[in-house]
């Protein structure tokens, strides 16, 4: 298995790039966001997921960071989501936007590209469970640096519920100290 590949972008196509590594060109499927940030000749590092399709053809999927790769891996475990669909979701939504959509139960964020309301609901339900099980440091940067969220999680509150309450408090009182946010969150969560 391949964990990551570093090389020069040789070609950019509609859904993949050809990455030249040691004079070998690897076809790597990437999100539209990656396609837009790459230029021919760029030296980039991609984290790789390997998939062998029904015809026994190996396909490589590349991500600029582990966070995007982690969300991709979670998405493909959901019934009805294949690699192509997961990549189209990541083309449309960043991991932070996926997290926010899950927290806010926003089915509309996932709809489109063959995803209807029922599948969008399944995505939200299954990701709520999977995100709550992820270690806090793997969720994403705004969670990593949030002491108030870390405090609530250490007290046993669910990550998504605590995050939602903290975001609500911070939107109403953006200058609140960490202690104030924790106090208000505990009041709200104990109701």
Swiss-Prot record:
One of its GO terms (biological process) is DNA recombination. It is found in: Cytoplasm. Residues 1-64 are annotated as: Domain I. Residues 65-142 are annotated as: Domain II. It holds the Pfam family HHH_5. Residues 143-146 are annotated as: Flexible linker. The keyword DNA repair applies. One of its GO terms (cellular component) is Holliday junction helicase complex. InterPro entries: DNA_helicase_Holl-junc_RuvA_I (IPR013849), NA-bd_OB-fold (IPR012340), RuvA (IPR000085), RuvA_2-like (IPR010994), RuvA_C (IPR011114), RuvA_C_sf (IPR036267). The RuvA-RuvB-RuvC complex processes Holliday junction (HJ) DNA during genetic recombination and DNA repair, while the RuvA-RuvB complex plays an important role in the rescue of blocked DNA replication forks via replication fork reversal (RFR). RuvA specifically binds to HJ cruciform DNA, conferring on it an open structure. The RuvB hexamer acts as an ATP-dependent pump, pulling dsDNA into and through the RuvAB complex. HJ branch migration allows RuvC to scan DNA until it finds its consensus sequence, where it cleaves and resolves the cruciform DNA. Homotetramer. Forms an RuvA(8)-RuvB(12)-Holliday junction (HJ) complex. HJ DNA is sandwiched between 2 RuvA tetramers; dsDNA enters through RuvA and exits via RuvB. An RuvB hexamer assembles on each DNA strand where it exits the tetramer. Each RuvB hexamer is contacted by two RuvA subunits (via domain III) on 2 adjacent RuvB subunits; this complex drives branch migration. In the full resolvosome a probable DNA-RuvA(4)-RuvB(12)-RuvC(2) complex forms which resolves the HJ. This is Holliday junction branch migration complex subunit RuvA.
């Amino acid at each position: 298995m391949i964990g990551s590949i570093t090389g020069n972008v040789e070609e950019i196509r509609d859904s993949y790039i050809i990455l030249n590594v040691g004079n070998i060109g690897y076809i790597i499927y990437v999100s539209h966001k990656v396609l837009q940030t790459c230029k021919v000749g760029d030296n980039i590092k991609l984290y790789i997921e390997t998939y062998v399709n029904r015809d026994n053809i190996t396909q490589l999927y590349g991500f600029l960071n582990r966070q995007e790769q982690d969300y991709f891996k979670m998405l493909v475990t959901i019934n009805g989501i294949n690699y192509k669909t997961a990549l189209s979701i990541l083309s449309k939504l960043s991991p932070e936007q996926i997290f926010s959509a899950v927290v806010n139960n926003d089915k509309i964020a996932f709809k489109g590209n063959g995803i209807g309301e029922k599948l969008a609901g399944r995505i939200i339900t299954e990701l709520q469970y999977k995100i709550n099980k992820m270690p806090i440091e793997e969720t994403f940067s705004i969670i990593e640096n949030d002491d108030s969220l870390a405090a609530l999680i250490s007290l046993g509150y669910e990550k998504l519920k605590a995050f939602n309450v903290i975001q609500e408090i911070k939107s109403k009182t953006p200058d609140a100290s960490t202690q104030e946010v924790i106090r208000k969150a505990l009041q709200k969560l104990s109701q």
